Amino acid sequence: MEISWGRALWRNFLGQSPDWYKLALIIFLIVNPLIFLISPFVAGWLLVAEFIFTLAMALKCYPLLPGGLLAIEAVFIGMTSAEHVREEVAANLEVLLLLMFMVAGIYFMKQLLLFIFTRLLLSIRSKMLLSLSFCVAAAFLSAFLDALTVVAVVISVAVGFYGIYHRVASSRTEDTDLQDDSHIDKHYKVVLEQFRGFLRSLMMHAGVGTALGGVMTMVGEPQNLIIAKAAGWHFGDFFLRMSPVTVPVLICGLLTCLLVEKLRWFGYGETLPEKVREVLQQFDDQSRLQRTRQDKIRLIVQAIIGVWLVTALALHLAEVGLIGLSVIILATSLTGVTDEHAIGKAFTESLPFTALLTVFFSVVAVIIDQQLFSPIIQFVLQASEHAQLSLFYIFNGLLSSISDNVFVGTIYINEAKAAMKSGAITLKQYELLAVAINTGTNLPSVATPNGQAAFLFLLTSALAPLIRLSYGRMVWMALPYTLVLTLVGLLCVEFTLAPVTEWFMQMGWIATL
């Protein structure tokens, strides 16, 4: 018997999301206008809390849908205006271009990145050195490329290698269900479990590496570009401004990588089983023999384009998004990708997040119109200039660990800029606060997958169930990094940021605008 119209509508609404989640969103949509009539300020904060809730529940439903419904209602009932949303989007056009074009551009360089990580995995036998190499490679690449793309490449390598060994272990040559272990005997299962532990640790090291590198440059994370634009910094300025905090954090993060591997803490320390290495090496040898001259020239071209990308960013030859567009044009032209559908695949990863970011800007418009963060900012600004830096770092960190860091970074830099324009803080203090906001937004966010988009991408990937990487296990494995990155970052903001920045100014390396 066919279901009723009402039941059909209920099932279609937010698709496979749990019933309690659907009901919660409907309650939000009903309650918000009623609260807005009584107290716009309370209604605004309620909207922010609801939006953070949708981000925290990203595994239940992609936040664009529930967050978008809340944002549309907010505009309809007058919490903000469509014109203000348009102004926020226009002011952050560079970030949208970064997501649309840079992420798509790096998609066409995946062969080179796959080649790099494959060579690392098979060339380095020491697990400590291999873990450090993955962390450093991910950090370096994420300083210039999109972190999601770097993680996507490492996932591709891991899934490919897992599939190769799984087929051997299950004695099947054809593609099989990688989650089906029923055809694997006990001995192979023990080796497979060890291999899973090995891949889990490598993925976490690479994920943290993207955070370590991503915080250092204006293109490392989307919120970095928002903060750089608000402060009027170019690529080199941004790197130097952040370095009093980010360089010590990078060093301590890499030492943490070595320490957890050496002591086998928090689920780290598993080595690559020799039987697995033999299987993977045989496969790689066959692949290299089959690589044609055309394939080799593609890798060379992609490496040259990579040099162009780094040079163009460092010299600020154009806006970041336009440099990304040039990468798309060069990579597709010189590697023979001419089909519209093949080019279109490059945009599938970035456009949903670009749409979600536009919804973020709608909520930011509400925050500005309803002056939601004014009490918090006033509280922070009542403290001494020195204490303000730590307070901004801590408030950013707390919110970023449970919510999206683009959203958090945008809110706080807007509030700090408004305080500077009103004369509440000096330009020099504003620039120091911008560093505290950027580092506070990026570093503590490794605590949960909700804070780091790269972690969330890993958790929702096809690899996570294969290597038994759950939400809880990811939080546990990230814990040593969370503690070290957060505390070292706070100490640097407290003690090294102001004096080192002052020294940079005396040396003439940076200047207050």
UniProtKB/Swiss-Prot annotation:
Q: Which GO terms describe its molecular function?
A: sodium:proton antiporter activity
Q: What is its main location?
A: membrane
Catalytic reactions of this protein:
2 Na(+)(in) + 3 H(+)(out) = 2 Na(+)(out) + 3 H(+)(in)
Where's it found, cell-wise? Cell inner membrane
Instruction: Keywords in alphabetical order, please.
Output: Antiport, Cell inner membrane, Cell membrane, Ion transport, Membrane, Sodium, Sodium transport, Transmembrane, Transmembrane helix, Transport
Q: Which family does it belong to?
A: Belongs to the NhaB Na(+)/H(+) (TC 2.A.34) antiporter family.
Summarizing the function annotation, the protein's role is: Na(+)/H(+) antiporter that extrudes sodium in exchange for external protons.
Topological type in the membrane: Multi-pass membrane protein
- According to the record, the segments passing through the membrane are 23-43, 52-72, 97-117, 120-140, 144-164, 202-222, 238-258, 303-323, 348-368, 391-411, 447-467, 475-495
Q: Name one GO cellular component term.
A: plasma membrane
Q: Which Pfam families match?
A: NhaB (PF06450)
Instruction: Give the protein's recorded name.
Output: Na(+)/H(+) antiporter NhaB
InterPro entries, sorted: Na+/H+_antiporter_NhaB
